[in-house]
Amino acid sequence: MPELPEVETVKRGLAPTMEGALLVRAELRRPDLRFPFPENFEDAVAGRRIVALSRRAKYLTIELEGGDVIIAHLGMSGSFRIEFDGPGEGRIKESADPAVPGDFHRPRSKDEKHDHVVFHLDASCGPARVIYNDPRRFGFMALARREALAEHVFLRGLGEEPTGNALDAAYLAARFSGKAQPLKAALLDQRTIAGLGNIYVCEALWRSGLSPKRAAGTLVDKRARPKQALVQLTDAIRAVIADAIAAGGSSLKDHIQADGSLGYFQHSFSVYDREGEACRTSGCRGTVERIVQAGRSTFYCPHCQK
């Protein structure tokens, strides 16, 4: 499932084409994805200019002129691509570095089997199509008003973003104080950190030398202040997310960028999906193990993560 860095990468790839463009019409090729599309979705968004693209946790938001906002979730296998309706000056850009999000767009191609939504745009570079493809159909789209966005059923109750200054050790100490819950489960709670998923929790715990099985409350002292280990964990979370965004996310099964290229952070994994391989901590002679926590795979080194 695409996590925060993947969705951020998609947002950055779509924004140069979509922001400021006129959404001429939305074409729905089926009545639903994971959930039914909002009633009159096509009519509600047609003829509206796109003001801005943003991201909240693992959700992409597309703000339209007039205050309506499209909320999109990629589910397990969803992806966007940008295609232009014909050759023309400035419509197709190629970069020496195709991994840069948004620097490469494709000419129009034949429709693919799982192209379920097509946004037809009048963009600054000419007519374009932004196509949502989702083989498993676990993604979904919803509509909300800008002023009520934070309280939308999909967004309300989300915790702090791991990319902002609000996520610090004091914040996590307040959330973890007195908790016997395993550290990994506490970090995956979207009410604590919005958008943080399985891959990047494993990587952050390895970077900070902490066991995923350790009780979250052990990182907080008796006065509910963060111990140094929690400070290090907070720094590791922010760093691993920043590194993953810079690498364009991780391409494991289904994630591709809006330009059709792959993310590269999976080549930097230190523990995730490395069961049985040597730990990459300097001087550590341990090997990466896989355990299951709450039905999900956890990868860690029991030798150096305590």
From Swiss-Prot:
Single GO term (MF): damaged DNA binding
Record keywords, A-Z: DNA damage, DNA repair, DNA-binding, Glycosidase, Hydrolase, Lyase, Metal-binding, Multifunctional enzyme, Zinc, Zinc-finger
Domain of life, source organism: Bacteria
ZnF bounds (FPG-type): 270-306
SS bond partners: none
Annotated function: Involved in base excision repair of DNA damaged by oxidation or by mutagenic agents. Acts as a DNA glycosylase that recognizes and removes damaged bases. Has a preference for oxidized purines, such as 7,8-dihydro-8-oxoguanine (8-oxoG). Has AP (apurinic/apyrimidinic) lyase activity and introduces nicks in the DNA strand. Cleaves the DNA backbone by beta-delta elimination to generate a single-strand break at the site of the removed base with both 3'- and 5'-phosphates.
Subunit record text: Monomer.
Record's protein name: Formamidopyrimidine-DNA glycosylase
Provenance organism: Sinorhizobium medicae (strain WSM419) (Ensifer medicae)
